[in-house]
């Protein structure tokens, strides 16, 4: 569900069906293969114009969205401001860069006083852009967080699968200051740095996406919503600790027999972390905070391993279980040990909360694959 091969494009006939749900990543006619949306669950197509313009409505919250392929005569900013003028709403520029522009707007839409966010992202492969508008009525402003998440669901390139979305990048930008971090991994002291705002920015994303996740507590698509929750944290976290990940890899890889040996050093490191919850509303500790000695739980530790491995170009994912209230790290490896299959791959699983265990060893009572949900990563 999260690889290019599994990314799907809706046919025009399917898009005309109001019952059609947009799940996982979806792409568009007229844009490159790496341009996609990873929308929150239970958005469906209310109306469409051909295969390039769609009005979306959400089944679990009073939020609507428009996704439209647009030509870019000049910059994303110009295309976005032109769209706002046509919509006849008031707006203020929240931020722009060479790839995208973002505005916050308010005005009357469909006869209701409304508020929302709009962005245009540029597809470098075709020169076209995607206009993405997400809004709710002012009386439903408490759901505006879902509109933010819709904006952040847009990926304009393969690199965006590993980076903060447009909203987080432009509204919560990096600082100009970096802070030193140190970690003892595999007997070696790793010295690196992270942006000074990495922790606070990451925690904002985590808290927001947890609000999104709570919308699906009683939804039949709760598992898919859970998967997206972790995917959104993954893509944001990959960027926050990318330099640290690469410093770890390049300082350790020459001493490791293979990728599994490297991954074992990460697993042993996370097993020694202090246990703590409630770092954020969701109880998920941000990865930057963990580098400063903050406590963590199983899912944050599993995510830490997955992020470092993915940043090191090593195939990994995580498995989560509502039944066991637990999470496991997972690594694509031909080493012996207990593994779970996801898609067409077998993943060696790792227990992050019991010191001394190696990859492929978990509690016997937790080996039922049916009780685990895979979170596949790019």
Show the residue positions of the predicted features.
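Conserved polar/disulfide-associated segments of primarily extracytoplasmic proteins
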Residues: 45-136
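Bacterial N-terminal signal peptides
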Residues: 11-18
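Bacterial N-terminal signal peptides that target proteins for export
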Residues: 2-9
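Hydrophobic/aromatic-rich core segments of domains that either
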Residues: 256, 288, 300-378
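Secondary-structure boundary elements
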Residues: 226-293, 353
